[in-house]
């Protein structure tokens, strides 16, 4: 059984830090407070705790700082907010004058560094009402136990749009992301060696240099930290174009498949059972979800009915009856039994919904996609004519435009770019002129679509001996990278360090005398060395899965993967389509 979320990885680390730096800092026995959150801190707290946890910390009400609220002048307020003008102005409005103060006093905790102009604004306006004003350095969302996101929705556009007018916006986004990544490292108590993928774009290089400088500054200032030199961890920064295939391929592992094929929003799955509409949240508190989310759909469909039978046999052993009334009685006596059944019903529905979509259209696509992605068929024979593999998909009227675009992209990726003439012909024949930018704009990510010169394809690790399903032969590039990083096999020209490489990662035994003392290299790895990965512009659920798989295989090193956001193929193609549009038009379309 999976441990509860309170004991689970990154979420637990973040919650413990918030408890220590926020709640323990302002807690008084028997005193209740109102808590004010902005959009980001609402997501942050929701990702790592429940309302019951907040009640235990003396919080009686949680409110949105942006909304109009009734004054509660007899109570103190705890503000957990981002250091932005909008959030600070809302706080100042609450304490506009002594006679109009909304609350008795304020405890302010910023997620990260508060700029001097905002700090001085607070100091000048209402310093007498403030009991605390601190920065806690947690400016990311722990999405899963080994996954973090920065929640920077504009990052993809600013980092990859070709519009030179976006240069200032891009610089600002880069600074923000660097600050946030530093808080990830600080929360994990790490000062990693920073490396980046050197080609084809310079985003990763720029961001890595910023992060390196900010890490240096952070550990100079943070007197409480024992870490001054580099620790035994690595941080890899990568541009999204490093692996376009994994972003558009149909994945058949459970979580990736469900988020691709079904309308799951905010991790909420809607389904029907007994003629009633129901909702379920796909979260790590659900031990069954944790157990099966990275398994192939074929395995999931075998496993859930087996679990149903196990519970059924438990019921029979307990009651000796199989009637509905006996089952009802048992559920009353054993609430955990009802909870187990509910979970299994949810996941069986989810798996069946995935399979219905798969059988309808996706099954025929998958063989084509795998052959194009790998350049070989299921028997290991080389694909000689990629166009011949693609054509049946384009001629099939049952496939929608989005699936055809995904197949065309895989075809182009497989041959490392095509000619303008060939691309025009494909677009016209499939009648996707209005969506053609979903294909062409990949070039802004450094992916060869209509290349000026022939580029070599990166070499892949030989995985032919690994056991796979025929329609799931592709392995995301990021798994190769993670494994090579842990085994110290990354090419230093392709993956330069921003500063001197930590000794333990370059095979040397020397360790900085200033760094946090640890027993020895092997002991350190055993106690949890970290490989932290950051992808600029989104990660896929298949890449998320790789972080868990590699951690499981290399128990001496935990892989933590993160990005600006977690993407699905459809959302990514929509974002790519907008890259050559003006920023105001992009915002307008998204608002609609």
Curated annotation (Swiss-Prot):
The keyword Transport applies. Gene3D superfamilies: 1.25.40.60, 3.40.50.1910, 3.40.50.2060, Syntaxin Binding Protein 1, Chain A, domain 2. InterPro entries: Sec-1-like_dom1, Sec-1-like_dom3a, Sec1-like, Sec1-like_dom2, Sec1-like_sf. Belongs to the STXBP/unc-18/SEC1 family. PANTHER family: VESICLE PROTEIN SORTING-ASSOCIATED. Interacts with DOC2B; the interaction is direct, occurs at the cell membrane, excludes interaction with STX4 and regulates glucose-stimulated insulin secretion. Interacts with STX4. This is Syntaxin-binding protein 3. It comes from Homo sapiens.
